[in-house]
Curated annotation (Swiss-Prot):
Function of the protein: Cooperates with CIITA to promote transcription of MHC class I and MHC class II genes.
Name of protein: Zinc finger X-linked protein ZXDA
Lineage per the UniProt record: Eukaryota, Metazoa, Chordata, Craniata, Vertebrata
Region (Required for transcriptional activation), start-end ranges: 572-699
GO biological process terms, semicolon-separated: positive regulation of DNA-templated transcription; regulation of transcription by RNA polymerase II
Organism, as annotated: Homo sapiens
Length: 799
């Protein structure tokens, strides 16, 4: 900020040099050449202390204060306590045309120049008019530098005005030249001998050639009211002398060159609307760069070729050069960190990361992380097993838990070279080996040749690898342990551990996709089980449990078989038959209308007392109870009482269900009806049965079960005595494999059956016991020729 900017188009002071000061001193007044009505232009510089807003008062504040009205300079002031300071302001007057009157002439010929120093609220005494006695009545703070008429012979174009003012008992030299006002501390020799500046207030004009001077240095004449400026409306506490001098220096100079006194030199920023002051010159220069940088001025450029960075200060350039030299003088003090930085600012930014290290803490290992993202990435390392096997293909960074998973992934890199494609309609999978395609085709055909040989298991699989993986359950090979402390769970498969690990996160990421269902689960298996509830439509069920006392439905045969093994304890031999029984004829289509005459309890009792053939009895019981095999009770009741024709080729019974043998309903004429339903004790003579004309009934994978035709060796049945036995010669039986079209290995082995009539018992009348044999399908067909007899109570039929 230059003072000429505040005083634009200012006139030049005209005055001559030389001449003395007359004793009587004349008043300075307007020259005759001045235009009428023209008054000097007023400029106000208002220094203020820190208590009033700082030493650098904005220029717009000063201009606002200059426009306000105020009391007269010499108006009476209220008395203030001693020691209080006064605010003050200086008025700069632009010179106007005219000449200063010469010495001895009593007339002013030249411009009028007035500089007023107005006292603050601390003025004392009553002032009215001129004070011949000097400034003593006005107090120590009266400041005045009023040029008086002086004889000037030849005023020059570059004349200067100088004077001395006292501010808070400190004398300052005042110089006004070419429109520029300068204040400076006077040298020691400039003071008069014996003067006491702190005790003698005065208004002093230093003598200088060419300028009018006051006759009495102490005079403070009354000024015209039109030259008085407004006074600050509200009085403020008096600033200290040093602070007031600093404020004055900040207001009066762009660089604040105010002399060598301590605390006086201040440097004011010249930028508009800035007003900041600085105690040292280099501080002002540094501050000016902030204004120039906003205008694109960055004078400090990096000297290294190819860099091109520019900076506003040399310090920033020096700091930048450290990055080229790889110098990192600022090291992180955190223990175990070891990082260093080129600037302290980067170090502070790095230290904030250490301050936030405890914000996100892992609950498993108590390790801390600065962000939630890093904590989440760390937690996955706890809940996922180690993945030591990495893909070796270029550009692929995937890792796997097992070698088999890695091999499976590697095949994906050879998709273009695969030659074996699935020919099943709708399936376009390809494989690099024929054996893999063969395993895949089993998923379409339903073939599962790899059977688990563990006792009571019965699971089968499409490949050996799946079977070996399944056997881990039987061996209790739980090689995948949960790493969470206190959990202790282990799993046979890695994918099971991964699914379990999600439960430790406390989240439920698996959401039911059914519209309107908001169920959420922490494990995928739980979601799978839940999803079945939405499929409980009757039309979607495919299989029903074959056990008559169970009404459960299943969507697949596999789930039905699992249910039978776990819930009904069905053996694997029956499960093997059920798995292959895809074309069994429903028993409801084969039974007669009189099927319900026998209850389930009576059917179970038929197979309850089988000595040494428990598995066979359980098998047949399950078949009967499941509804696969049924018995026509009415036909059984009349089996042995039917009429045998003369050709001895009567059927024992009609083939209804495979194990049931029916006879004709007409009882033989030679036998008493009471033999079967009464109390008379009669019996058959010993006779033999053959299988000449046996009608075969095919039951599919269960094998061919024969309806035997009973032949009597004699034309008429002979009466039986209690000691007689009816035997069946197995040598005369024709194997069923030759009587049916489909040969089944599970065909029941023909057994030698005997009817033993116990002595001292009624054969049929008194609910006698008839014994006949059932073969054991699970036994050895070649080694066993005879079977133990089954005791049947209430009725008799032959299988």
């Amino acid at each position: 900020m230059e003072i000429p900017k505040l005083l634009p188009a200012r006139g030049t002071l005209q005055g001559g040099g030389g001449g003395g000061i007359p004793a009587g001193g004349g008043r300075v007044h307007r020259g005759p050449d001045s235009p009428a009505g023209q008054v000097p232009t007023r400029r106000l510089l208002l220094p203020r202390g820190p208590q009033d807003g700082g030493p650098g008062r904005r220029r717009e504040e000063a201009s606002t204060a200059s426009r306000g009205p105020g009391p007269s300079l010499f108006a009476p002031r209220p008395h203030q306590p001693s020691g209080g300071g006064d605010d003050f302001f200086l008025v700069l007057l632009d010179p106007v045309g005219g000449d200063v009157e010469t010495a001895g002439s009593g007339q002013a010929a030249g411009p009028v120049l007035r500089e007023e120093a107005k006292a603050g609220p601390g003025l004392q005494g009553d002032e009215s008019g001129a004070n011949p006695a000097g400034c003593s009545a006005q107090g120590p703070h009266c400041l005045s530098a009023v040029p008086t008429p002086a004889p000037i012979s030849a005023p020059g174009p570059a004349a200067a005005f100088a004077g001395t003012v006292t501010i808070h008992n400190q004398d300052l030299l005042l110089r006004f030249e070419n429109g520029v006002l300068t204040l400076a501390t006077p040298p020691p020799h400039a003071w008069e001998p014996g003067a006491a500046p702190a005790q003698q207030p005065r208004c002093l004009i230093a003598p200088q050639a060419g300028f009018p001077q006051a006759a009495h240095p102490g005079d403070c004449p009354e000024l015209r009211s039109d030259l008085l400026l407004a006074e600050p409306a509200e009085p403020a506490p008096a600033p200290a002398p040093q602070e007031e001098a600093e404020g004055l220096a900040a207001a009066l100079g762009p660089r604040g060159l105010l002399g060598s006194g301590p605390g006086v030199v201040l440097y004011l920023c010249p930028e508009a609307l800035c007003g900041q002051t600085f105690a040292k010159k280099h501080q002002l220069k540094m501050h000016l760069l902030t204004h120039s940088s906003s205008q694109g001025q960055r004078p400090f450029k990096c000297p290294l070729g190819g860099c091109g960075w520019t900076f506003t200060t040399s310090y920033k350039l020096k700091r930048h050069l450290q990055s080229h030299d790889k110098l990192r003088p600022f090291g992180c003090p955190a223990e175990g960190c070891g990082k260093s930085f080129t600037t302290v600012y980067n170090l502070k930014a790095h230290m904030k990361g250490h301050e936030q290290e405890n914000s996100f803490k892992c609950e498993v290992c108590e390790e801390s992380f600065p962000t939630q993202a890093k904590l989440g990435a760390h937690q996955r390392s706890h809940f996922e097993p180690e993945r030591p096997y990495q893909c070796a293909f270029s550009g692929c960074k995937k890792t796997f838990i097992t070698v088999s998973a890695l091999f499976s992934h590697n095949r994906a890199h050879f998709r273009e070279q695969e030659l074996f494609s699935c020919s099943f309609p709708g399936c376009s999978k390809q494989y690099d080996k024929a054996c893999r395609l063969k395993i895949h085709l089993r998923s379409h055909t339903g073939e599962r040749p790899f059977l688990c040989d563990f006792d009571g298991c019965g699971w089968n699989f499409t490949s050996m690898s799946k079977l070996l993986r399944h056997k881990r359950k039987h061996d209790d090979d739980r090689r995948f342990m949960c790493p969470v402390e206190g959990c202790g769970k282990s799993f046979t498969r890695a994918e099971h551990l991964k699914g379990h690990s999600i439960t430790h996160l406390g989240t439920k990421p698996f959401v039911c996709p059914v519209a309107g269902c908001c169920a959420r689960f922490s494990a995928r298996s739980s979601l799978y089980i839940h999803s079945k509830k939405h499929l409980q439509d009757v039309d979607t069920w495919k299989s029903r449990c074959p056990i008559s006392s169970c009404n459960k439905l299943f969507t697949s045969k596999h789930s039905m078989k699992t249910h039978m093994v776990k819930r009904h304890k069905v053996g694997q031999d029956l499960l093997a038959q059920l798995e292959a029984a895809n074309s069994l004829t429903p028993s409801s289509e084969l039974t007669s209308q009189r099927q319900n005459d026998l209850s389930d309890a009576e059917i179970v009792s038929l197979f309850s007392d089988v000595p040494d053939s428990t598995s066979a009895a359980l098998l047949d019981t399950a078949l009967v109870n499941s509804g696969i095999l049924t018995i026509d009770v009415a036909s059984v009741s009349s089996t042995l009482a039917g009429h045998l024709p003369a050709n001895n080729n009567n059927s024992v019974g009609q083939a209804v269900d495979p194990p049931s043998l029916m006879a004709t309903s007409d009882p033989p004429q030679s036998l008493d009806t009471s033999l079967f339903f009464g109390t008379a004790a009669t019996g058959f003579q010993q006779s033999s049965l053959n299988m000449d004309e046996v009608s075969s009934v095919s039951v599919g994978p269960l094998g061919s079960l024969d309806s035997l035709a009973m032949k009597n060796s004699s034309p008429e049945p002979q009466a039986l005595t209690p000691s007689s036995k009816l035997t069946v010669d197995t040598d005369t039986l024709t194997p069923s494999s030759t009587l049916c079209e489909n040969s089944v290995s599970e065909l029941l082995t023909p057994a030698k059956a005997e009817w033993s009539v116990h002595p001292n018992s009624d054969f049929f009348g008194q609910e006698g016991e008839t014994q006949f044999g059932f073969p054991n399908a699970a036994g050895n067909h070649g080694s066993q020729k005879e079977r133990n007899l089954i005791t049947v109570t209430g009725s008799s039929f032959l299988v």
